[in-house]
Amino acid sequence: MAQVQGKIVQCIGAVVDVEFPRDRMPKVYDALKLEGSPLTLEVQQQLGDGVVRTIALGSSDGLKRGLMVTNTGNPITVPVGKATLGRIMDVLGNPIDERGPVDQSLTASIHRKAPAYDELSPSQELLETGIKVIDLVCPFAKGGKVGLFGGAGVGKTVNMMELINNIAKAHSGLSVFAGVGERTREGNDFYHEMADSGVVNLENLGESKVAMVYGQMNEPPGNRLRVALTGLTIAESFRDEGRDVLFFVDNIYRYTLAGTEVSALLGRMPSAVGYQPTLAEEMGRLQERITSTKVGSITSIQAVYVPADDLTDPSPATTFAHLDSTVVLSRDIAALGIYPAVDPLDSTSRQLDPQVVGEEHYQVARQVQGTLQRYKELRDIIAILGMDELAPEDKLVVARARKIQRFLSQPFHVAEVFTGSPGKYVPLSETIRGFKMIVAGECDHLPEQAFYMVGTIDEAFEKAKKVA
């Protein structure tokens, strides 16, 4: 069948209206190619009278009325499979790493249905991260979905990098990293970090363990809206080959924001706080595809920017519903100099259940949270009356809570260059043993500074000797 041609009748920024013969209009989500240009347009609406409204996936500079456009008859397709490993691609699957073309022999559409209900396979297996606070109070599930929530500058990307460092390097499977509307510098840093650690094999790209898809801050909204789907399509193809895949998204909020921009450009009526009326549906369509089947698993770790530190904002609130574990980063904890700045009282996990993690882990985690909660309640009294007015048992709770708070900090491998402290990976068994000793009162004689920025409890005892 011959490809149908149309012509541009209107350009408003990233929105381009194209007129086709009335009986051969493109379908919604069809990809249109501009003649004599690499620009791709994606159909978003059919306006009637043969006119379709499209979003430009690239710069619309130089477009004018009357230019000819060809309908490809298919949605956007991107390369998938082994050819993507070790490569950096844009939203359309074009290489942006100056290492030659990507093999297009295996491609897939970025728009596809989520797996059927009977194909799904929930997992109870824990994924150890080596980060104490996460392993203790909000453990991750293999094949689960994790969100890192935080405002500006509290450490989402650093935490994401450490998780990649601890999990992706030890993980024998493959990883896919989707950079959605974040800083180009961070994407560049990530690539070099992966190359230095051997996850990207520069000598033989096919031996690499990670595929990267970037649609950064400076890209048009159409690119930022679709780049998460491009990354997900690559991850799905690896999963359908029977592999266990790690899928990192930094930042899922920018996906929502790009949707808001596109929605406004298309002339839709905004809903709460100016977001698109289709926010829940767009988020659901993406998140329902990030799932594990009986063939293979996708474990997804997503950074979620929280506008103005407001967790009730519609964008983070919509994301919450889809996650198995939520890691909430707090500005108050970061202000105390405790990194990672994870709030152990706000962070939750579906896995923190005695039938999944075991009775000992569950009890220790709940005792730690109980001690910290009691300290939080006592802080107002301490601020007004001072420590001396507290009952002896409350003084003990405060002392233990401050030790727990400091013991929840940990030096990161990816931050070694800034802190000068070597990074620490703490096994889950050591994490449980350490916190169990603190809540049982076995460390009451140690000064609280001995617990700051150490790995295991044994290191805290060593540090206490030096402090003394």
UniProtKB/Swiss-Prot annotation:
In its keyword annotation, does this UniProt entry include Transmembrane helix?
no
What Enzyme Commission number(s) apply to this enzyme? Answer: 7.1.2.2
**Reaction(s) catalyzed by this protein?**
ATP + H2O + 4 H(+)(in) = ADP + phosphate + 5 H(+)(out)
Q: Where in the cell is it found?
A: Cell inner membrane
Q: Which GO terms describe its molecular function?
A: ATP binding; ATP hydrolysis activity; proton-transporting ATP synthase activity, rotational mechanism
Task: Please tell me which top-level EC class this enzyme sits in.
Answer: translocase
Question: Could you tell me which NCBIfam families the record lists for this protein?
Answer: atpD
Q: What does this protein do?
A: Produces ATP from ADP in the presence of a proton gradient across the membrane. The catalytic sites are hosted primarily by the beta subunits.
On assembly, the entry states:
F-type ATPases have 2 components, CF(1) - the catalytic core - and CF(0) - the membrane proton channel. CF(1) has five subunits: alpha(3), beta(3), gamma(1), delta(1), epsilon(1). CF(0) has three main subunits: a(1), b(2) and c(9-12). The alpha and beta chains form an alternating ring which encloses part of the gamma chain. CF(1) is attached to CF(0) by a central stalk formed by the gamma and epsilon chains, while a peripheral stalk is formed by the delta and b chains.
The family note in this entry says: Belongs to the ATPase alpha/beta chains family.
Q: Output this protein's name.
A: ATP synthase subunit beta
